[in-house]
Amino acid sequence: VLPICRGSYIRFCWFILAMPLEMKLIHWCWYEKKWYCYIWLSPCLWLLFIMLNMIPKIIHYCWFGGNPLPEDAQKCIASWKKYLPGYEIKEWNESNFDVNCCPYVREAYQAKKYAFVSDYARFEVLYREGGLYFDTDVEVIRNMDHIVAAGNFMAFEKSLATKLQEEGSVSTVKAVGVKSGLALGVAPGLGLGVAPGLGLLHELLEFYQAKEHFAVEDGTVVDYTTALLRKHGLVEEHRLQQVAGVTIYPVDYFCPMDSTTGIITLTDNTVSIHHYSCSWIDHNTFSWRLHILKNKLIGLFGEKWIMKISRILKRHM
């Protein structure tokens, strides 16, 4: 069964047209006022086409700005090597990616908002080469060959804006620049795997290329990706979904950490942990420091009491 999305559909059509006549049989029939095409391919051709649509064994990550990789990022990359042996790991930075490729990327780079540069870069690289992508704060804890073998994938997270609004951290929501109202978001940074030429990525690239300027308050890659997937049929339900040729996995697969509390809930499905370093947020703001302090207190005294005290304080502030 082929994933029906623009990229794979077009590749399949060209694949059929390029094959010698003796290696395929094409039958047309007229049924209920519509033409239907039945194509028979030899088993070797099916195998070849499947191989062309497999996710390559490459792990991509982005690191713009020229600073050395922090220790936490190095540990995460080491976990990729441990649980995904045999994969080539490629870093993308100023030396091998054009940061002037479009106005959005150029202005984000000039503003030193490197996480937003990587939002575009990951899609361009994956559309061209295919493979896996992880943010540098993603720790892999189990082998995920079964997920890669199942085809193109992304994963859900609970919207950071929704979580912060539940806390009452309105100032942090504004500083973050993400849009509210999404109980679930599809976050490409958690883990993203695709074969080359996926149509969904082409649409995302076109979206970014059409933006005349970069502005943090316009939204994040989670907002843009989720909105596009909704146009393709994504529903607001926490379950595994197939949308636009991509499997969207539930939160527990790639995002077991609660970004509000820092609590990690592992299940048998969990293959990685996103540690939410949030490099795109100003870590010097009072609201962010308060958010981190609350997480540490939850770790010491438990979520129930700290959240209760937090709600009481908010009512009297």
Language model regions located:
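Tryptophan (W) side chains
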Residues: W14, W28-W30, W35, W40, ...
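Intrinsically disordered, low-complexity polyampholyte segments enriched for Lys and acidic residues
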Residues: E22-K24, E32-K34, N53, K179
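Small-residue hinge/turn detector
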Residues: D119-G131
